[in-house]
Amino acid sequence: MRPALRQRMQIVTKCGIKLVSPQRPGHAIKSYDTSAAHVRASVEASLRALRTDHIDLLLIHRPDALMDPRELAEVCAQLRTEGKVAHVGVSNHMPSQLALLHQHVPVVTNQIELSPLCLNALSDGTLD
């Protein structure tokens, strides 16, 4: 990517879901994974695919019931120190999940699913 073009962009990408596809033969089932190894591998893959040296906002996509907030905080801090990730956010977390994670990771945003076709966030506690 040309540096002049990159400077005019904010790159936001997600990690934390192992999708099933022909490009991912090691993923037998769709699952969530916020382990340090998976987050780091996802960031490195995004950097290569996007041909950039850093991500402006990394979103942890969907809550992971097996998440270790301290492990996630450590890898996020390392990625920030390395200059690979500027900010960390989450996607589709309930307020209690966001509060737990925020104790360990400086989360800057929570992207929620809300559209004319999906109004659940207005009544399911997401906006509490």
PLM regions: where:
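Active-site groove signature of glycoside hydrolases
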Residues: 47-66
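Active-site mouth loops of central-metabolism enzymes
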Residues: 24-40, 61, 66-67
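Conserved, mostly hydrophobic/aromatic
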Residues: 11, 46, 55, 88, ...
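Beta/alpha (TIM)-barrel catalytic core signal, keyed to glycine-rich beta->alpha loops juxtaposed to Asp/Glu
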Residues: 63-128
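Short, acidic/polar
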Residues: 32-51, 71, 92-100, 122
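Structured loop/turn residues at beta-strand edges in well-structured enzyme cores
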Residues: 7, 41, 50-53, 83, ...
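N-terminal small/glycine-rich loop or linker at the start of catalytic domains
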Residues: 12-30, 54, 59
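N-terminal binding-site loop/beta-alpha segment at the start of enzyme catalytic domains
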Residues: 1-14, 53
